[in-house]
Amino acid sequence: MDYRKFGECYYIRMDRDDEIISTILEICKKENIKSATFSGIGGCKDAEIQTFIPETGSFEEQHISGMLELASLNGNVVTDKNDVYYHHTHAVFSYKDGEKHCMAAGHMKSITVLYTAEIELRPVTGGAIHRKYDPETGTGFWDFN
């Protein structure tokens, strides 16, 4: 992995076997970025997709592997009032299943790079976005206070 800052944005090149989400969080901590958005593309080999089930307040997980074309990666990083980091990441993958081209998408728990991933990390300027737990839904939301 390597990254550089140009202007207000960080440009990250991830390499084989890098885990995308944990790497983004590590860079945010190292650079003292408390809230940011990010996007990216790449070639991956492993992904854990989560779907939130409101009735149970838990996530269902699906694991996909193989040559996964990361067609779209979007997300954000925020902290809570205690400076604990959280991510909210969604991705879309295309892959082949026999002769069929398939897609998989959703909320991401982890993504492992096969060849490379190219990520743009955009810190929030002029303020901070925090995360606040919502007991009614059992999940966290942005807090601007």
Descriptions of predicted regions:
Residues 1-39, 45-87, 92-145:
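N-terminal intrinsically disordered, cationic/polar leader segments
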